[in-house]
C-alpha cells in the first residue's frame, strides 16, 4: 500500500491557513475541521504546518498573549513531505524518525493531501485484518469438517 491509495480512501481535502492568521483563528479552525494540524499556505506555496502540539507548546511558553500571535511565529517550517508513490513502511519510518504526526503529500511540488499517523495506523490495521481473513478462509477451505 502506498500514500496514493491512502489518499484515495480518505480523500484529499486539506485544511489550510495563512501564515498571517492568528493562533486563535488556527485553534478555532482546528476545532471546526476536527483535525490535528493545518497546512500553512502562502500564494499557493506550502510554507509550514501548525499543529495542536505547536499551539500547546506556544501557550506554555508565552501564556495568553499567544492567542493574538500569528501562525507564522510558531508554525513548523522545513517540513518533511511525502510523495504519492511512497510506500507505507517508508512513510512510517519517516514519521517515526522525525517525530511528526502529520505529513503533507506533494504531487509535482504541489500540495496533494495530508497523511496523519492515525491514517497510517488505520490503513495498516485494515491490511492486517484482510490478511487474517484470507488466512482464516484458506485454513477453513483446506480443513473441511467431517
Regions found by a protein language model. Name each.
Residues 1-12, 51-81, 87-96, 117-146:
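Tandem CBS (Bateman) regulatory domains
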Residues 21-32, 61-74, 109:
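Short, charge-rich amphipathic segments
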Amino acid at each position: 500500500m502506498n500514500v496514493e491509495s491512502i489518499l484515495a480512501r480518505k480523500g484529499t481535502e486539506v485544511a489550510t491557513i495563512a501564515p498571517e492568521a492568528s493562533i486563535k483563528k488556527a485553534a478555532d479552525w482546528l476545532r471546526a475541521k476536527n483535525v490535528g494540524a493545518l497546512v500553512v499556505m502562502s500564494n499557493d506555496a506550502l510554507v509550514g504546518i501548525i499543529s495542536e502540539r505547536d499551539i500547546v507548546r506556544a501557550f506554555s511558553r508565552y501564556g495568553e498573549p499567544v492567542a493574538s500571535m500569528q501562525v507564522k511565529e510558531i508554525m513548523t517550517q522545513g517540513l518533511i513531505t511525502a510523495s504519492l508513490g511512497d510506500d507505507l513502511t517508508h512513510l512510517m519510518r519517516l514519521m517515526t524518525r522525525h517525530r511528526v504526526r502529520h505529513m503533507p503529500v506533494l504531487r509535482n511540488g504541489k500540495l496533494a493531501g495530508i497523511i496523519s499517523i492515525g491514517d497510517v495506523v488505520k490503513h495498516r490495521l485494515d491490511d492486517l485484518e484482510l490478511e487474517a481473513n484470507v488466512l482464516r478462509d484458506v485454513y477453513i477451505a483446506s480443513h473441511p469438517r467431517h
